[in-house]
Amino acid sequence: MPEIVDHAGDVDDLPAFWRRADSANPDVAPILWLHGVPTSSDDWIPFLQKAGGIAPDLPGFGRSAKRGDLSYDIDFYCQWISDFLDRISVDKVRLAVHDWGGLGVAWALRNPQRVEKLVIMDAVPFLPGYKWHRMAKIWRTPFLGEFAMGLTSKRTLRLISRESNATPGPLPKELIDDAMSHFDLGTQRAILRLYRSSPSKVLAQTGKDVGNITCPTLVLWGEKDPYIPARFADAYAEAIPNATAERIADAGHWPWLDKPEVIGRVCDFLTS
């Protein structure tokens, strides 16, 4: 099992935190794991333990910078990903994204020469036809979003998370504890700015050239994802020339929590 080492440093004058583990296959480009909302690189620990790679806390999340003067929009994150990889002297990657880690798809469109393989899991779709889920609509609404953020606690997150996965009950205590341990005003601000800068038309416009992604791509989706319907797995597979879609029965938004074998499927694809 690869040893996971924590790192901290500045990326373009912004403090950043990331985890890194030696690859199970050192002859290929490292895997870059990009997490979603409202979590951190902690999501990827079981993947790092199996396949190695690099998992940053994106700005606004976890232990990375949460400055108030940042835009936290798609352009900002795409530039940050490039700056981060340059900072750690990594040129090409094999990329895995989940939820808002799907910003990596937007980055891949701008940097196709840097991506050798791609896994998309239950990610925000840069495709036509997506309508934001109920919680996102609240966050996108001024004042109401701030009010909802102020009410968020471990208890409310446990209640909300009951719809997130197919297994009865809330998300695992460890995931909720991790999310809430970093859910300060800086993270709340980043989430609100990210959602408010990303109406459906911006998502579709961002991904209008998604067919230009030509690397081997695996699209995995929990069949019971309540936030992003599984039909977007098929939509991504139709739009990306070298992509295959697999719907995961009895799995929700974090499919590997309902079906741990997803971890092996993802790691095998990325390391082969």
Language model features by range: what are they?
Residues A21-R63:
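Conserved HGGG/HGGXW glycine-rich cap/lid loop of the alpha/beta-hydrolase fold
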Residues L32-G36, H98, W221:
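The conserved beta1-alpha1 loop
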Residues A55-V97:
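Active-site loop/oxyanion-hole signature of alpha/beta-hydrolase fold enzymes
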Residues K117-F147:
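Flexible "cap/lid" loop of the alpha/beta hydrolase fold
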Residues G129, G150-G211:
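Conserved alpha/beta-hydrolase catalytic His-Asp/Glu region
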Residues I213, V219-W221:
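Short beta-strand/loop motif that positions the catalytic acidic residue
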Residues K224-I228:
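Acidic catalytic loop of the alpha/beta-hydrolase fold
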Residues A251-P260:
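Catalytic histidine-centered segment of alpha/beta-hydrolase-like enzymes
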